[in-house]
Amino acid sequence: VRLASLIAVVLVYLANDIAAQQLEPLNVSYASVTGSRIPLWIAKDAGLFEKYGLHVNLIVIAAGNAAIGALASGDVEILGAPGTTTMVSAAKGLPFAIIGTFGPADWKLAAHPSIRSIQELRGKTVGISRPGTTIEFATKRALVKLGFTPGKDINILATGLAESNKRLMVMYQGKIDATLVSPDNLFEAEQKNLKLSLLADLKELGIYTSASDLSARRDFLKSQRRRARGFLMAYCEAIWLGKANKSAALASFRKQMRENDPARLETLYKNYVIDALPLKPYPMEEVIQTDIENLTSTVPELRGKRAADFIDKTIFLELEQEGFFKTMSNTYAK
C-alpha cells in the first residue's frame, strides 16, 4: 500500500512537472499598480494564462525609456503602458504595434484646496508622471483647453510617479499644485477627509485617453503567433470573467492592491471593471489618431501618419472570425 501511494505521489508530481514544462513562457510588463491592470491580475489569479498554454511573468516597469527598452530588447514580449510612448517609438523606427487597450481613462484635473478656480492655477506647478507619457500629453492638452500655455503660464514638473495617488500625496506635500487624478483617487481622498479642488473633467473638455494600452513587437506577433494569441485570449476572458463574477475581480483587487476596505473595493470594481473595460478590447483608434494630431508639432516623424500605421488588430479579427467572443458571451452571459 505504501509503495502504491508513493508511486501515485510521484506520478502526480511528474504529471504536474510535465504540464508546467509544456507551458510557454511570456514576460508581460505594466507601468504601475493601479486598478486598470485588473484583467492581467484576474488572468493570473484565475489560471487563464495557463488555460491558453502560457506561463506568464508579470513585471512592473515604469512607463518611459525603461519600458520601451525592455520591449525593444525582448526582455518583455507584451508591454502594458500608454500607447503614446509606443507610437512615438514606432514612428522613430522601432518595430512596435499597439494590440489592445485597458479601456478609456477618466481623468480629472485636481488642485490643492487653496486653489479655488482655474485662473488661480496661473503661475503654479502641475505635476505629471514622466516626459513622453500619456499623462504629460493629456495634462498639456487640458491646460491649453483651459486657456494656458504649458511651460509659460504654468510650470510642468515631472514627478517620476506613474501612480496618480502618489502624485496626489506630492501635491498635499506642497511640491506641486495640481495633477490629474482618477475617480478612485477622489474616493480615497474623501475617505481620508483630504480636501481638494476639482478644476476640470477631461472628458468634458473633449480630451479622451486610454487608461493604458497593450503593445508588442511586430516580429513577435508574426513569429510567436501562438503565444500572442494565447495572451490576448486569456486577457479577454479575464475581462468577461471579471464582469460576470464580481467576487473573482474583488479577490484580485485584494491580492494585488492589498486593499481590504469594502467601500474602496466597490469603487475599484465600478470604475475599472464595469465602467471602463470593453468586452472587446481593440486598440482605441480614435484616441490614437487624436494623439498623433496633438503630437505632430513636437514629433515630426508622425507627420502624415494615421492610427492604423501603429495598430495591429489581426489577432482580434481572427478571434472574431473563429467565434471566440461568441463563446465568451455564451459562457459568461448572465
Question: Where do the model's predicted regions map?
Answer:
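Bacterial N-terminal signal peptides
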Residues: A4-D17
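Ligand-binding clefts/hinges and TM-proximal coupling segments of bilobed small-molecule sensing domains
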Residues: T134-K152, M233-E266, I311, E318-L319, ...
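Short linear loop/turn motifs
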Residues: N57, N65, N155-A158, T267-V273, ...
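Conserved C-terminal helix/tail region of periplasmic/extracytoplasmic solute-binding proteins
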Residues: E293-K334
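Secondary-structure end/capping motifs
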Residues: K222-G304
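Short, glycine-/small- and polar/acidic-enriched structural segments
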Residues: Q21-P183, L198-Y208
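Pocket-lining segment of extracytoplasmic ligand-binding domains
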Residues: T84-T85, E163-R258
